[in-house]
Amino acid sequence: MSSLSSSLAFVFPGQGAQAVGMLAELAAAHAVVRATFDEAAQGAGVDLWQLSQHGPAEQLDRTENTQPALLAASVAVWRVWQQLGGTQPAQLSGHSLGEYSALVCAGALSLHDAAALVAERGRLMQSAVPAGVGAMAAIIGGDDAQIAAVCAEVAQGQVVAPANFNAPGQLVISGHAEAVDRVLAKLTGMGVKQAIKLAVSVPSHCGLMREAADRLGERMATMRWQVPTIPVVQNADARTYHTVAEICRALQRQLYQPVRWTECVRVLAAGGATRVAECGPGKVLSGLLKRIDKTLATHAIGTPAELDAARAEWA
């Protein structure tokens, strides 16, 4: 039986962490990886392992495929950690889609149901806004309050607002494409370090997703939920909830409200976390963690070498 550590937290990545070939090395060493993908595929209705290993990338990057594939990947890494007797974290959190991975690992929802749910989430998000109508942009080196004020100033009746508070000085905005362009033009004129439109087809975490969130809530209501066995810090309010109804409402709101990632990480730290493992493919969150709180010891654990290093250091 592995021990519980109050100083250990796990975080789970969102869209953008996917890559063709992800977890191939881990799957070669641990049969549970492929089994986890196959289990998720039953819920999603897509051969997630084939898609993850062979692509093509443009199919893997379709949000209705990306979401269940990343969910499967993160849960697979978690299960490997469990099989190896890794120390149990006292807190979990996930970035956007990663919140669903965290809830599965905390026992709130089965992997099968979660895979079906996030595939539907992807379809609802994709169909919520016609192609070309929405956009997202990353802004590096700006002040959060100033950027929010510019969004309000240039909206002109359209939707544009902060979508991801990823780290200090690292913000993503989302909304109508024309309004996003106006914000970028204004910020560039104000001397913001970097402002780049993202190659995404869906303007996530803004008011354009409210109808999709309503329909997502209807789908959630058909599924079996449990109270998590490990606290999950949720994005919408950077806090944990202790009833199924509150958890589901927070998941709905997450679709049209910003991901408060900086605050989520600070809540983990305030709750006693000094070590944080990134549970899934890639190292996107590890980079953000270092920008948010340099005192946190971080490890990605998506490869055998990374797992060995984390277990050796954190045994």
Give the residues covered by each predicted segment.
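FabD-like malonyl-/acyl-CoA
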Residues: 2-147, 194, 198, 275-308
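Alpha/beta catalytic cores of group-transfer enzymes, especially the acyltransferase/condensing modules
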Residues: 15-17, 42-44, 106-257
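A short, flexible low-complexity segment enriched in Lys/Arg and Gly/Pro that occurs
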Residues: 69-76, 253-261
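Non-catalytic positions within long, well-ordered alpha-helices that form the structural scaffold/packing
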Residues: 82, 188, 269-272
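NAD(P)-dependent dehydrogenase/reductase Rossmann-like domain
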Residues: 179-180, 272, 304-305, 309-315
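Generic hydrophobic alpha-helical scaffold/packing signal
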Residues: 233, 252, 265-269, 286, ...
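A short, acidic, amphipathic alpha-helical segment used as a generic capping/interface helix at domain edges
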Residues: 256-273
